[in-house]
Amino acid sequence: MGAPACALALCVAVAIVAGASSESLGTEQRVVGRAAEVPGPEPGQQEQLVFGSGDAVELSCPPPGGGPMGPTVWVKDGTGLVPSERVLVGPQRLQVLNASHEDSGAYSCRQRLTQRVLCHFSVRVTDAPSSGDDEDGEDEAEDTGVDTGAPYWTRPERMDKKLLAVPAANTVRFRCPAAGNPTPSISWLKNGREFRGEHRIGGIKLRHQQWSLVMESVVPSDRGNYTCVVENKFGSIRQTYTLDVLERSPHRPILQAGLPANQTAVLGSDVEFHCKVYSDAQPHIQWLKHVEVNGSKVGPDGTPYVTVLKTAGANTTDKELEVLSLHNVTFEDAGEYTCLAGNSIGFSHHSAWLVVLPAEEELVEADEAGSVYAGILSYGVGFFLFILVVAAVTLCRLRSPPKKGLGSPTVHKISRFPLKRQVSLESNASMSSNTPLVRIARLSSGEGPTLANVSELELPADPKWELSRARLTLGKPLGEGCFGQVVMAEAIGIDKDRAAKPVTVAVKMLKDDATDKDLSDLVSEMEMMKMIGKHKNIINLLGACTQGGPLYVLVEYAAKGNLREFLRARRPPGLDYSFDTCKPPEEQLTFKDLVSCAYQVARGMEYLASQKCIHRDLAARNVLVTEDNVMKIADFGLARDVHNLDYYKKTTNGRLPVKWMAPEALFDRVYTHQSDVWSFGVLLWEIFTLGGSPYPGIPVEELFKLLKEGHRMDKPANCTHDLYMIMRECWHAAPSQRPTFKQLVEDLDRVLTVTSTDEYLDLSAPFEQYSPGGQDTPSSSSSGDDSVFAHDLLPPAPPSSGGSRT
């Protein structure tokens, strides 16, 4: 035993010498935090730390100089700390969870053998402000014993997360905990500019004691860079955070797969069904049990008979509603149970079965009797499945086409693209159940995510729409669309009456760097146009080239471009509001021409509504004009991912799509035919201002506030009172009170009938100011004569030409 004892004594001596020698080594500055751990202060120096009530106090004390430091003990106010559920003691780290005033005091980390102090901290736990009101922070300015100096961060490890992404409507808090002597001040910048409460709808909360900025109910316009500036007379420091606000998903509730799960219970036991619901909009949850009425589980209309077991009450929470508890189950409790969850978009449901078994002693007898039958049944089912597999393989071989020649390209990847169906049905409809699928085989030697160099795509041929590539001659580019480029072309065989005569068409095709999603979207748009059918006032599908090369989608060509530029090009010449003073003016428009434009667009939207299609982006820029001045609505078949569209930022040419959106679409992402009617009212305003920009000079943040307060745009100069009343009805705050497109067609037809053909526009009337760059000029939001707003929420009297609403 002599040798082991000597070795143990030698180890202890080495540890003591190493601890003593470490006193002479330099140390780095220590940082307190929940995540990062860095060296602590030099022995003898006391670190002053301030924590909020309820925070986790975490003290870190690495070995000085990085060497060994042996066993340690943590001491508070001279008394050793005893580990507990709230006090977590480690060799180099101490955590005190849910801190309170009693946890304030002097903490130190000491070597157990020598009692040498390795790190020393002074901790003070303060109350967080009880409300969001601004605090003056004077109680933070007392002398803390720290030497006079520039500001510094006290909790830098809590500031590591510089990018914050949160869903809309959440509360965001940025913190910059700092100290200095004298106590520094803190100010906030957004995108490099001073940020105050009046700069944001809903305001902000500045909690100086917490060195924090709080924003409640964030919206996408709150995106940006937020910088805290902490300074005193000796210096300043700053930290920048980036905030990204994620759009609310316009989707019916999503239920977690596999829940509720089937249950098997013994008579008299307790059972719980669980249903996990995910929904951005507030969900409503119910638990249902399927029952029989007169021996039938469904009614004459196919609706199942159910009993509501659990639903929302005054004091129930969503978490409570996600669990259905059944106590002391009986045989009558066996059956099908459904979790039904709904929101403003639609409904989702999952079902599960409960099987109730007799008591355990009865089960033993049943098992013995049933084991023989189970064995026979399993062998029989296995043999039957084997026969089915053999028959299926044989049938597939007989029906399979002959293999391609050696010169044919190899199919490297087959993708099954779910096509986003733009025919948006009523809010309770299941979009997924009606989603068409098109099987697409990519023929290429590449395996990358793009479709570059793809010479051929295998799409199922549709004889009704397929056009031979030999009959198509591509021409000049017309522009770039969502999925690729659009070119002019001449097609032979489009007009069945004159099959040999070439017809000018527009061809949509993918760009060279297109992705699989771009292909899916273009195919989706094509399929949507097939389903919606033809109408004079929409852009119609003419054909497609899907075989033997790139995908080409042929649509009608509109020679005069979009309605917005069509109107601007026909503004009276010689004035500063004309679209292009260097270009000869086009034909002058009469008042009846403008009413005709509106009437035709209403006709097109009436047809789309009858086909259950919601446009979601109706504006003059999405209406095209043919050579014969026929209005055609475009882009109604686009597979828009509406919760990813950034409607809160300017587009490249300065337009703000929020200005066409109904309040329920803008704030809640609810799109209906009624929200399209609101957009139609804005389009009417565009028409009668000859392509004016809605709400000129109004910042987006102020627009939100003004719309909520009921402000609406004033009557355009070249618009009658009756037409303005139609606009105002389209802008009713309640979607159900807005006219339908069928009613709008009737109203505009009535106005068109009584309008004189020779009634030209008043050239002396002022138009909305427009600059080719699309930048809005600053203007007042007051309600004066030049304001673009009117204050009354509803018109004082119904339009004389509008008729009654039903």
UniProtKB/Swiss-Prot annotation:
Autophosphorylated. Binding of FGF family members together with heparan sulfate proteoglycan or heparin promotes receptor dimerization and autophosphorylation on tyrosine residues. Autophosphorylation occurs in trans between the two FGFR molecules present in the dimer. Phosphorylation at Tyr-724 is essential for stimulation of cell proliferation and activation of PIK3R1, STAT1 and MAP kinase signaling. Phosphorylation at Tyr-760 is required for interaction with PIK3R1 and PLCG1. Ubiquitinated. Is rapidly ubiquitinated after ligand binding and autophosphorylation, leading to receptor internalization and degradation. Subject to both proteasomal and lysosomal degradation. Residues 771-787 have a biased composition (Low complexity). Residues 397-806 are cytoplasmic. Residues 132-145 have a biased composition (Acidic residues). Residues 23-375 are extracellular. Disulfide bonds join C61-C109, C176-C228, C275-C339. The modification Phosphotyrosine is found at Y647, Y648, Y724, Y760. ATP binds at L478, G479, E480, G481, C482, F483, G484, Q485, V486, K508. Glycans are attached at N98, N225, N262, N294, N315, N328. Keywords: Apoptosis, ATP-binding, Cell membrane, Chromosomal rearrangement, Craniosynostosis, Cytoplasmic vesicle, Deafness, Disease variant, Disulfide bond, Dwarfism, Ectodermal dysplasia, Endoplasmic reticulum, Glycoprotein, Immunoglobulin domain, Kinase, Lacrimo-auriculo-dento-digital syndrome, Membrane, Nucleotide-binding, Phosphoprotein, Receptor, Repeat, Secreted, Signal, Transferase, Transmembrane, Transmembrane helix, Tyrosine-protein kinase, Ubl conjugation. The keyword Disulfide bond applies. Residues 126-153, 765-806 are annotated as: Disordered. PROSITE patterns: IG_LIKE (PS50835), PROTEIN_KINASE_ATP (PS00107), PROTEIN_KINASE_DOM (PS50011), PROTEIN_KINASE_TYR (PS00109). GO terms for molecular function: ATP binding; fibroblast growth factor binding; fibroblast growth factor receptor activity; identical protein binding; protein tyrosine kinase activity. Changing I538V: In hypochondroplasia. Changing Y724F: Strongly reduced kinase activity. Strongly reduced mitogen activity. Residues 24-126, 151-244, 253-355 form the Ig-like C2-type domain. The active site is at D617 (proton acceptor). Expressed in brain, kidney and testis. Very low or no expression in spleen, heart, and muscle. In 20- to 22-week old fetuses it is expressed at high level in kidney, lung, small intestine and brain, and to a lower degree in spleen, liver, and muscle. Isoform 2 is detected in epithelial cells. Isoform 1 is not detected in epithelial cells. Isoform 1 and isoform 2 are detected in fibroblastic cells. It is linked to Achondroplasia: A frequent form of short-limb dwarfism. It is characterized by a long, narrow trunk, short extremities, particularly in the proximal (rhizomelic) segments, a large head with frontal bossing, hypoplasia of the midface and a trident configuration of the hands. ACH is an autosomal dominant disease. This is Fibroblast growth factor receptor 3. The lineage of its organism: Eukaryota, Metazoa, Chordata, Craniata, Vertebrata. Residues 472-761 form the Protein kinase domain. Present in an inactive conformation in the absence of bound ligand. Ligand binding leads to dimerization and activation by autophosphorylation on tyrosine residues. Inhibited by SU5402. The gene is FGFR3.
